Amino acid sequence: MKKYFLLMTAIILFSSCNAQQKKVNATIIDGNLVGIANKEMLQQAPFNAWYDLFYKDYQVDETVISQLKPHMKGVKIKLFIGTWCGDSKVATPHFYKIMEAVQFDEKNIELITVDRKKSTPENDQQGFDIQRVPTIIFFRNNKEIGRFVEYPRETMEADFLKIVSGQPYKHSYQE
């Protein structure tokens, strides 16, 4: 009886935790993750081969992190990547390391993995004009405040700081 009670308690706790998370529907198509995913999926084979390597090797700029952290309040992020894309393979682990450094709540990050056509089976990319990956879109009060596209102008931290603090910023493909 005691084991049954513990099992039921564990199931209820697990169910309530899962109910609060975003719907994760990513599947592997032609060897690539496609759909709404989470960081944990990238930390599993076969994606962990590149994720772990680029995460471990990245050193965040602590000076910029200390400036970035207070500006992250009220921000939500949509992160569009392709697990087939070299730039995404490098930038995604760096992005998550930066978010951990500023103690950003991952529930405010939506990871959308796209195919080579920059789409998902559920059209999660629709309305966001995703032309290159990675594309990281920052929102405040449900309005886009800026986006990082493919590679940094300065560093990822410095680019993010400009976006969330309201400084003038143009991503790598804006003139």
Q: What are the roles of these predicted feature ranges?
A:
Residues K73-K76, K107, N141:
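Loop/turn elements at helix/coil->beta-strand transitions in domains of secreted/extracellular proteins
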Residues K78-T83, E106-T120:
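Thiol-based oxidoreductase modules, predominantly thioredoxin-like and allied folds used
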Residues P70-A101:
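Local sequence-structure signature of Cys/Sec-based thiol-disulfide redox active-site neighborhoods
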Residues R132, I137-Q174:
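Non-catalytic, surface beta->alpha helical segment in thiol-disulfide oxidoreductase systems
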Residues K117-Q131:
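Short Fe-S-cluster ligation motifs
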Residues L111, Q131-R132:
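Acidic/His-rich structured neighborhood in mature extracellular/periplasmic domains
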Residues M1-V24:
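Bacterial Sec-dependent N-terminal signal peptides
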Residues C17-E62, S66-H71, D159-E175:
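Non-globular targeting/processing and membrane-anchoring segments
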